[in-house]
């Protein structure tokens, strides 16, 4: 199953439909997660793997990725040899939706136990983040505290996904109407959501300084 998921590129129409950063995303009830896994194997060389997941059998794409993490990142937890050095990985996700609250909490918990894994998440749209005190907003703040870099996708990110994950048959990526405006709007919204996190960090710093 893993080989199948890793080898299949997204159809063009499916990518455009699910990743379109429209304000009213009707009918987009699944999360698509395109990923890149990198590991440094030398001063000037890295291993590189990529693929995509989507929700399957009530399992969210984020949790599905974690389920296959051992196969995607061999040596992440070591090989059972005493005193061995665990391998470090850098993972980038490009998600059609930002993670739900439960996935965010579980991811943050997992990352706290896996310091040799670095995760960046690019999102096309924000999931259930309109309400000020929503659990989804709190989940994103928790991910940030866990060291995850969360960013709203811009034109260059959509272009990269088109080049990397889509069966495009040499066709060029064409920006849809209001791609840039929606990206800027969502980026500002995400910044406001994550702002309390930065305020708390400042408070902690002031406490350490005795101010």
What are these regions (language model features)?
Residues 1-211:
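Zinc-dependent deaminase catalytic domain
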């Amino acid at each position: 199953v893993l080989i199948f998921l890793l080898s299949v590129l997204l159809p063009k129409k499916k990518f455009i439909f699910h990743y379109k950063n429209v304000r009213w995303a009707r009918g987009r009830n699944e999360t698509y997660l395109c990923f890149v896994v990198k590991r440094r194997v030398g001063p000037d060389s890295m291993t590189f793997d990529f693929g995509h997941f989507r929700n399957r059998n009530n399992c969210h794409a984020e949790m599905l990725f974690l389920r296959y993490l051992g196969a995607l990142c061999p040596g992440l937890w070591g090989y059972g040899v005493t005193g061995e050095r665990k391998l470090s990985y850098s993972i980038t996700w490009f998600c059609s939706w930002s993670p739900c609250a439960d996935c965010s909490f579980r991811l943050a918990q997992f990352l706290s136990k896996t310091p040799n894994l670095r995760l960046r998440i690019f999102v096309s749209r924000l999931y259930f983040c309109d309400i000020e005190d929503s659990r989804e907003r709190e989940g994103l703040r928790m991910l940030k505290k866990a060291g995850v870099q969360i960013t709203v996708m811009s034109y260059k990110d959509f272009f990269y996904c088109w080049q990397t994950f889509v069966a495009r048959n040499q066709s060029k990526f064409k920006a849809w109407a209001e791609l840039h405006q929606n990206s800027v709007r969502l980026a500002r919204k995400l910044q406001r959501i994550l702002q309390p996190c930065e305020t708390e960090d400042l408070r902690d710093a002031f406490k350490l300084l005795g101010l």
